[in-house]
């Protein structure tokens, strides 16, 4: 392994990979290299991989690289009092994890608005006791702090299974006040299908929907979110929904 001198940005990259498990090159570029060329981003990340702070995985030659925490990254964080685990191999459902981290990036690129973002795999370590585990819990300053629970649907679950999970949110979660449940899908067609089922079930809990690609492109503060309980709803911002 080569020896490198770490910058503050390097440390933030390593820390974020530890929390997020696996981040794509593009996700890291959006978070930490907004005005840097793709080649320069890859060079910076390769340097951290070669030094052992990160590990890299690529499903095939044409796939985007995934970056996780390496052994020297683990030692770096533990020296700062942060418990961390080296990432060995992406999970079988890596597409779902990448999608959740796309949500993370869409939230965290606006640091003045975000209060917190916790993915499902972080919640147990924070004392989450409910059997129902959302894909993410997001806190936003709108300007008052508001909490949103997030479900990311790739269309791989059956509709009865997903609707059954949504039904679990209807009565709320003890000790976890939340403004709304955000349903994020990969396609507009899937979102419309879910909206029809939400209306059919007659849910009272506010459920706001959007498409992941639009959220990634425009950010969490954009007017993207539709109230799925309504027929032909207008798109609004989360700030407007919190008023």
Task: Label the model's feature ranges.
Residues 2-5, 11-17, 25, 156, ...:
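Non-catalytic C-terminal interaction segments of nucleic acid-processing enzymes
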Residues 1-87:
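Nuclease-adjacent, charged terminal/linker segments that flank catalytic cores
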Residues 85-101:
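A short, highly charged nucleic-acid-interacting micro-segment common to nuclease
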Residues 98-101, 163-167:
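Well-ordered, non-membrane alpha-helical segments in soluble/globular domains
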Residues 101-107, 172:
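Metal-dependent nuclease catalytic cores in nucleic-acid-processing enzymes
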Residues 57, 92-93, 105-149, 154-164:
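Active-site metal-binding core of divalent-cation-utilizing nuclease and nuclease-like domains
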């Amino acid at each position: 392994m080569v020896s490198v001198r770490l910058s503050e940005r390097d440390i933030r990259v390593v820390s974020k990979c530890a929390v997020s498990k696996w981040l794509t090159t593009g996700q890291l570029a959006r978070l930490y290299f907004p005005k840097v060329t793709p080649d320069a981003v890859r060079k910076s990340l390769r340097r951290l991989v070669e030094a052992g702070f990160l590990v890299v995985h690529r499903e095939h030659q044409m796939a985007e690289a995934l970056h996780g925490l390496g052994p020297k990254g683990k030692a770096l964080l533990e020296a700062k009092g942060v418990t961390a685990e080296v990432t060995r191999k992406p999970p079988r459902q890596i597409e779902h994890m990448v999608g959740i981290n796309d949500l993370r990036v869409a939230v965290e690129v606006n640091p003045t608005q975000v209060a917190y973002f916790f993915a499902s795999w972080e919640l147990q370590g924070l004392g989450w006791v409910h059997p129902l585990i959302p894909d993410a819990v997001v806190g936003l300053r709108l300007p008052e702090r508001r909490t949103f629970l997030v479900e990311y649907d790739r269309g791989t679950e059956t509709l009865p299974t997903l609707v059954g999970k949504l039904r679990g949110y209807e009565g709320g979660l003890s000790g976890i006040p939340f403004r709304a449940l955000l349903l994020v899908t990969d396609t507009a067609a899937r979102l419309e299908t879910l909206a029809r089922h939400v209306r059919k079930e007659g849910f009272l809990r506010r459920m706001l929907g959007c498409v992941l690609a639009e959220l990634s492109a425009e950010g969490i503060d954009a007017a993207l979110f539709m109230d799925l309980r309504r027929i032909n709803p207008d798109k609004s911002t989360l700030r407007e929904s919190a008023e």
